[in-house]
Amino acid sequence: MLRYSAHLPLKGIGASGQKRIRDAHVALIGVGGLGCAVAQYLVSSGVGQLTLCDFDTVAESNLARQILYRQSDLGRLKTEVASETLNALNPETRVQSVTHRVADEDMLKIFPACDLVIDASDNYGTRLAVNRSCLALKTPWIMTSCIRLEGQIMLLHPDLPEQACYRCVYGNAPDTLEDCPGAGIFAPVAGISGTSAAHFALAHLAGLPTPAGLHVFDAASWQWQSLGINKNPDCKDCSQILEPVIR
């Protein structure tokens, strides 16, 4: 416990909260700018098991904001490099990897063993797939995203049917939304958004209350805004939740 001794005096965490963190299994979708920051704090804070899901390789354009990787890692699988770095950071955490693009059927196999899912991917289609799978399994999950000088984060509770789901918030937005290579991303904003997601994750796992709604960060004005989200009674994802089919 010495490694985590700074957590122990904190009201609402203490030894029991740290044990809940230690006993938790988290799936992380995407190990890019957001995912690197999330993974570092989850592992350094003692999450028991972390499953990394990413099929991409390290490119030079990643290095400014994806802080688990180095120049010597170019061309290697991100999950491979991240696992090595995270194991060196804290060998007490079991890190495992999925190195292909995860689809709905993969998520329905991976997520049942998880206490929490974090989506740090860079596309709307993947987030919708995570939303569908977590709704079916009633698994809590965190959405985090960033672009330009803006970041977003939201903790979703599919086990609470009165709460909105991801599609309730974003509707039928196309998968042609702007991305970081096209619109740009200020490197520290990826870190701020990722560490904020790690905060939400660790607080949730430890049993601390976390604020509901969508939380939006604007680095240009250095302001956070929290938005209340209403459930859409006609949402095609959460208005008729199907039981999972796990093969």
Predicted regions and their residues:
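Aromatic pocket-lining residues of Rossmann-like dinucleotide-binding sites
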Residues: 42
